[in-house]
Amino acid sequence: MKEIVHEKIQNLDLKEYLINFIDEKNHFSFGILSFKHYVALSGNRSSHILTLAGGIELLILAFDIFDDLEDEDNIEIKWMKIDPSLALNAATTLYTLGLETICSISNSAEFHRLTLKYALNAMQGQHEDLRNSPETEEECIQMMKQKAGSLTAMSAVLAAMLANGEFNQTIEDYAYKIGIIKQLENDYYGLVNDQRSDIRKKRKTLIYLFLNRKFNEASEKILKLINSHTSYHSFISDSSKFDELLFEAGLNQYVSMLIKLYEEEITASMNQLNINIKL
């Protein structure tokens, strides 16, 4: 990622910001997902997949910055500590660099079309999230599929196309589910992270919609705490007590069941294609 920035960016001040932001990354799960698919499908040009993975991770970093700026999240991270206009310009630069890098790997019009489709769909999913639009669990899952699933689909599908030159619908379908799992895990983490704005802004995540069905007293208690920002953050400081309440509400079981269901569907689809990837 840094090599791409050093090669493409001449403005030294902007370059320094981008390198510092890249240093903030501590996971590269989207690039790894691409790499695993490329290897599983017998791709043999390491320079191609490394370039793809780097381009995708630049794009993911851009989306992370956009997301934090829009949600006012993670206030201790580097891009949230500078002038928002500079952070926004840096994110736009990373977004453009990511797309340019990805599209430079292949001359295929279909490869380019899919790259832009997934990026555009992810932004539309983010718009629905910012609008707090979902009213039902089905609508929320569709939003998660667009917002997060589009990026996991990009990672897996483009790697497969690099390996064998073909678009595979089955890979796209299960890759969307990988993204839904990632988003669900992220939303669950948002329950206990006081750096996140999910609670303060009452985001209609799948978790919130489940609680809002008020199956039991524990669900209602959590909702009341959510409506009292100070009480909520005081309560979650006692993690064992909060975990117990989540369990009583049935939330832990609900999230675990959904993840297990999607994982089983993903594994079944991979087995059909003789793809052996550990997620």
Curated annotation (Swiss-Prot):
Changing residue 134 to S: No change in ComX production or secretion. Mg(2+) 1 binds at residues 67, 71. Keywords: Cell membrane, Competence, Magnesium, Membrane, Metal-binding, Prenyltransferase, Transferase. Changing residue 234 to K: No change in ComX production or secretion. Coiled coil: none annotated. Changing residue 63 to S: Shows substantial farnesylation activity when FPP is used, while geranylation activity is severely reduced. Changing residue 152 to I: No change in ComX production or secretion. Binds 2 Mg(2+) ions per subunit. Optimum pH is 8.0-9.5. Mg(2+) 2 binds at residues 67, 71. The keyword Cell membrane applies. It is found in: Cell membrane. One of its GO terms (biological process) is isoprenoid biosynthetic process. Optimum temperature is 37 degrees Celsius. One of its GO terms (cellular component) is plasma membrane. It catalyses: L-tryptophyl-[protein] + (2E)-geranyl diphosphate = (2S,3R)-3-geranyl-2,3-dihydro-2,N(alpha)-cyclo-L-tryptophyl-[protein] + diphosphate. Its cofactor is Mg(2+). One of its GO terms (molecular function) is prenyltransferase activity. Part of a major quorum-sensing system that regulates the development of genetic competence. Involved in the maturation of the competence pheromone ComX. Acts by catalyzing the transfer of a geranyl group on the ComX pheromone. Cannot use farnesyl diphosphate (FPP). Belongs to the FPP/GGPP synthase family. This is Tryptophan prenyltransferase ComQ. It comes from Bacillus spizizenii (Bacillus subtilis subsp. spizizenii).
